[in-house]
């Protein structure tokens, strides 16, 4: 029991630990957390479950980088199991709205909503690392309440399914019929399969 508590505490501390980077300047030193330092290089990370707070942070970073330089690409690194559809759609809409082209790179996994964000990057600038996995499926949802309310939510999730499949079809070039068929169950694709499907454009094995 004590070992489990120690192990859980270590896991928690690793999960919340953010490395710091120290840079030397003429006026002394300045320290950044690693993500802020990478943001200076126009790199944004989508990691973990997609939810409202995380999505708001991603949107804010994209808008900030657009204000800094509307002509320079933004690099979006994705390692996410997916999450809340409306949260993900706020990121998606912002990606399509801003002037800079957004290059998407999957490392680890891009599942569900994260897969849509991966494939919605600028054409020719969507990448996977060699051992990444992409998973597409239909929306998940559940609701408790009065029968009429359950019917309303059921209609809404079916409309959301149609919208997501239409977007996936647009970005991949696959037919709506094929997207509907493939997303009926969890559909896992390797990096190579993701290229053939049209989810990404290239596999990155080494930095050029």
UniProtKB/Swiss-Prot annotation:
Active-site residues, Swiss-Prot/TrEMBL: 112, 137
Catalytic activity, as annotated: Hydrolysis of proteins to small peptides in the presence of ATP and magnesium. alpha-casein is the usual test substrate. In the absence of ATP, only oligopeptides shorter than five residues are hydrolyzed (such as succinyl-Leu-Tyr-|-NHMec, and Leu-Tyr-Leu-|-Tyr-Trp, in which cleavage of the -Tyr-|-Leu- and -Tyr-|-Trp bonds also occurs)
The protein's Enzyme Commission number: 3.4.21.92
Keywords attached to this entry: Cytoplasm, Hydrolase, Protease, Serine protease
Gene3D superfamilies attached to this UniProt entry: 2-enoyl-CoA Hydratase, Chain A, domain 1
A GO CC term attached to the entry: cytoplasm
Biological process annotations from GO: protein quality control for misfolded or incompletely synthesized proteins
Enzyme class: hydrolase
Subcellular localization(s) per the UniProt record: Cytoplasm
Molecular function, one GO term: ATPase binding
Keyword Hydrolase: yes
Subunit-level organization: Fourteen ClpP subunits assemble into 2 heptameric rings which stack back to back to give a disk-like structure with a central cavity, resembling the structure of eukaryotic proteasomes.
Annotated function: Cleaves peptides in various proteins in a process that requires ATP hydrolysis. Has a chymotrypsin-like activity. Plays a major role in the degradation of misfolded proteins.
Family named by the database record: Belongs to the peptidase S14 family.
Name recorded for this polypeptide: ATP-dependent Clp protease proteolytic subunit
Organism, scientific name: Buchnera aphidicola subsp. Acyrthosiphon pisum (strain APS)
